[in-house]
Curated annotation (Swiss-Prot):
Subunit structure of this chain's protein: The complex is composed of two ATP-binding proteins (MetN), two transmembrane proteins (MetI) and a solute-binding protein (MetQ).
Protein name in UniProt: Methionine import ATP-binding protein MetN 1
Organism ancestry: Bacteria, Bacillati, Bacillota, Bacilli, Bacillales
Gene for this chain: metN1
A GO term, aspect molecular function: ATP hydrolysis activity
Residues reported in the UniProt entry to bind ATP: G38, Y39, S40, G41, A42, G43, K44, S45
Length: 341
């Protein structure tokens, strides 16, 4: 649906060249809710602006719905843009226009009939839960209601793609949750592909099925949300995951436990998925290795509606200790594990 092929984007200011994007490659599949996460200045917003040609790539290719738009003119982009809706952090509503007229604006500009405009706007306001606000003005609405108006406006042209640039960053946690629920409903009801730009890992965790992690203009990690949460490969991905889920004990706790430890030991970090949570893993390990298993840390969370568990286990070691059977058990049970010591 959306594909970036070795995309780079540079800005030239005075005598300075700023590389906003460097060799970015990944694909957003049809019906995905695809998250792009990174800190401020990572290049996220520049990336999403390439999709609707608000910016043009310096190098590489941008493919949108099978069209290579990299070198498209504004005229060539007109039909493509009809299939792309966009919402922003600060809503971008017309304060002098009613809610109805704000939502209707794309149809008015497309010179649709009054009958079609009324029918379509009414449908969208009902979908976002604002039918009773149609005659009010943006200044009379809450932040969450303003974003719902923006979503209705983005959907009124029946797009295939919805771009969300920090759409929940200006909202409180409760309102954010309601907007994310609405966006998930947009995806499921209309089959719209959503590309989410955010710096909040909780947004990725709650709504996205796939994610790309950006740092300094580059994509440093991609995968399903479950893959990235279960085994983040890069430091920045690990840092983002730790903002919403504690996946291991604190350094101070490990240091204290190590100081109290008598004899050699080996630690394992394991990730247990929902289908395995009810399995007698600890009991199995005790029987396999013939010794006690210490649980130094355990944390349960929900990712995409699935319960997952992170554990840190410790085995005391002696000459008879053989980790081969333990490793084999984890592999047979399809439990992701990492030997820590």
């Amino acid at each position: 649906m959306i594909e970036f092929r070795q995309v780079s984007k540079s800005f030239h200011k005075k005598k300075q060249t700023i590389d906003a994007l460097k060799d970015v490659s990944f694909t957003v599949n049809r019906n995905d809710i695809f998250g792009v996460i990174g800190y401020s200045g990572a290049g996220k917003s520049t990336l999403v602006r390439l999709v609707n040609h608000l910016e043009a790539a310096s190098n590489g290719q941008v493919i949108v719905d099978a069209h290579d738009i990299t070198n498209y003119s504004d005229k060539m982009m007109r039909d493509i843009k009809k299939d792309i809706g966009m919402i922003f952090q600060h809503f971008n509503l017309l304060n002098s226009a009613t809610v109805f007229k704000n939502v209707a604006m794309p149809l008015i500009l497309s010179k649709k009939s009054k009958t079609e405009i009324k029918q379509r706007v009414t449908e969208m306001l009902e979908f976002v839960g604002l039918s009773d606000k149609k005659d009010q003005f943006p200044d009379e609405l809450s932040g969450g209601q303003k974003q719902r108006v923006a979503i209705a406006r983005a959907l009124v042209t029946n797009p295939k793609i919805l771009l969300c640039d920090e759409a929940t960053s200006a909202l409180d946690p409760s309102t954010t949750a309601s907007i994310l629920t609405l966006l998930k409903n947009v995806n499921q009801t209309f089959g719209i592909t959503i590309m989410m730009i955010t710096h909040e890992m909780r947004v990725i965790k709650d709504i996205c099925n796939r994610v790309a992690v950006m740092e300094k203009g580059q994509v440093v990690e991609t995968g399903t949300v479950k893959e990235v949460f279960s085994h983040p490969k890069t430091t920045i991905a690990q840092n983002f995951v730790s903002t919403v889920i504690q996946t291991e004990p604190s350094t101070s706790l490990i240091r204290r436990l190590n100081d109290e430890q008598v004899g050699d030991f080996k630690d394992y970090k394991i990730f247990v998925e929902e289908t395995q949570v009810t399995q007698p893993i600890i009991n199995d390990l005790i029987q396999i290795c013939g010794r006690e298993v210490k649980i130094l840390f355990s944390s349960m969370s929900e990712i995409q509606g699935n319960t997952v568990c992170y554990m840190w286990l410790r085995f005391n070691m002696d000459q008879q200790f053989d980790d081969t059977a333990i490793n084999q058990y984890f592999k047979e049970k399809n439990i992701q594990f990492e030997e820590v010591h």
